[in-house]
Amino acid sequence: MLWIKNLARISQTTSSSVGNVFRNPESYTLSSRFCTALQKQQVTDTVQAKEDVVNALEPQRYDGLAPTKEGEKPRVLVLGSGWAGCRVLKGIDTSIYDVVCVSPRNHMVFTPLLASTCVGTLEFRSVAEPISRIQPAISREPGSYYFLANCSKLDADNHEVHCETVTEGSSTLKPWKFKIAYDKLVLACGAEASTFGINGVLENAIFLREVHHAQEIRRKLLLNLMLSEVPGIGEDEKKRLLHCVVVGGGPTGVEFSGELSDFIMKDVRQRYSHVKDDIRVTLIEARDILSSFDDRLRHYAIKQLNKSGVKLVRGIVKEVKPQKLILDDGTEVPYGPLVWSTGVGPSSFVRSLDFPKDPGGRIGIDEWMRVPSVQDVFAIGDCSGYLESTGKSTLPALAQVAEREGKYLANLFNVMGKAGGGRANSAKEMELGEPFVYKHLGSMATIGRYKALVDLRESKEGKGISMAGFLSWFIWRSAYLTRVVSWRNRFYVAINWLTTFVFGRDISRI
């Protein structure tokens, strides 16, 4: 019995000693670290093994739209939803091709009427047409899609583009990256507003190229009108808030100035009578306004704009500060809303592409809209221009140019597809027929007070009809009403014009 008791004491002592060893903080930490590291390594090895198995079982795995196979329709990928891109989408034969559109906006903007939305003459939806209405196959066909995304990289050798979804600054949504393989690629990504490297333009000016630009201008204009009536505001600050400055004397700048003067004379004078004598419009241009129009029409436009209260200033903007801009002669011009409309230039995406460029930095193309250095890549619209080797001058960045290029390219694709050249690398030796030829159909611009300019000459030096006045305004409205993309939008535009004529412009700040 004594032997058994001694053995029990020894066992308790040993067990207690071992327990004390493992309860030692240093010993416990080292052990747990070792075990944790071992477990993590085992988990990592397991995950890697699973990935290896998946990759082995799925050799064709593709993050996006994989290359088309035999028996499937060839895929035409269109980057952009402007005039050129949407005209391709509209004209392409979807019984031959699947179409995919990638763009940060899901609609086309009818830009000739965009200035009218800034002051409430038209509603914003009247100038926007959804892509799925332009090409119904996008919402119906299993192989056709629209993706809300931007193209981040172009791999022409492998016939694929890398895209990233647009989340519009949402903190809860992370951009998703994916790839799209194509048989034919159409670069119709447009251009961006030219700032000429002037300090402060991007931070302080508003451009007029998209619907959200028009919305911003409208909200800014109505906000300044309301703030100018607040008691106690200084006289200088009131004049600054009510001074609308437009930089750029092209058709967009002149049309916006005309719409703005109509808004002031008809609506502001009735509904903001306390400040009706303080609101002003200034149009700044470095050269002659409407330089592409006939001289007689230009002088008529200047006369009418002056009658409408628009002040014309010739000068070059050197710097834009938060509440004033500085001209080349040192003149300081205070402003409330500042609208920048000085033309367009290549976008950052176009500049990043390793393609030959035209003299203006746009994607270089031949007479068939092809990018000569790569296979199955075409460029149309404002992002493209003829290479010097073609001997052709670069076409102007106009809606009618982009639309007609898009129509030509859609017809070219349809012919190629019917001849068996729709797939990637299948049209290398194919005769493409007649090259694209542009014929200018003329220019039109409204200048306010039921007046407009119509210049139907093929060039500034050519002969043709040019007219101005009320009849021109009627022609301008009739032409654009018939050119609006769909019957739905034509109905909207006609109703908006009628309600504005009867009840005046909507001044709600929404």
Swiss-Prot record:
Class of this enzyme: oxidoreductase
Motif (Microbody targeting signal): 501-510
GO MF term (any one): NADPH dehydrogenase activity
Record's note on what induces expression: Follows a circadian regulation; up-regulated in a diurnal manner. Up-regulated by high-light.
Disruption of the gene: reported phenotype: No visible phenotype.
UniProt keyword annotation of Cytoplasm present: no
Positions bound to FAD: 75-105
Cofactor names: FAD
Record-linked Pfam families: NDH2_C (PF22366), Pyr_redox_2 (PF07992)
Principal place of residence: mitochondrion
Record has Transmembrane as a keyword: no
Cellular compartments per GO CC: mitochondrial inner membrane; mitochondrial matrix; mitochondrion; peroxisome
Catalysed reactions, as listed in the record: a quinone + NADH + H(+) = a quinol + NAD(+); a ubiquinone + NADH + H(+) = a ubiquinol + NAD(+)
Gene3D superfamilies with a match to the protein in the record: 3.50.50.100
Protein localization: Mitochondrion inner membrane; Peroxisome
Expression by tissue: Expressed in seedlings, cotyledons, young leaves, stems and flowers and, to a lower extent, in roots and buds.
Cofactor remark: Binds 1 FAD per subunit.
Keywords: FAD, Flavoprotein, Membrane, Mitochondrion, Mitochondrion inner membrane, NAD, NADP, Oxidoreductase, Peroxisome, Transit peptide
Gene Ontology biological-process entries: cellular response to light stimulus
Record EC number: 1.6.5.9
Function as written in the Swiss-Prot or TrEMBL entry: Alternative NADH-ubiquinone oxidoreductase which catalyzes the oxidation of mitochondrial NADH does not translocate protons across the inner mitochondrial membrane.
Protein family according to the UniProt entry: Belongs to the NADH dehydrogenase family.
Protein name: Internal alternative NAD(P)H-ubiquinone oxidoreductase A1, mitochondrial
Organism phylogeny: Eukaryota, Viridiplantae, Streptophyta, Embryophyta, Tracheophyta
UniProt gene name: NDA1
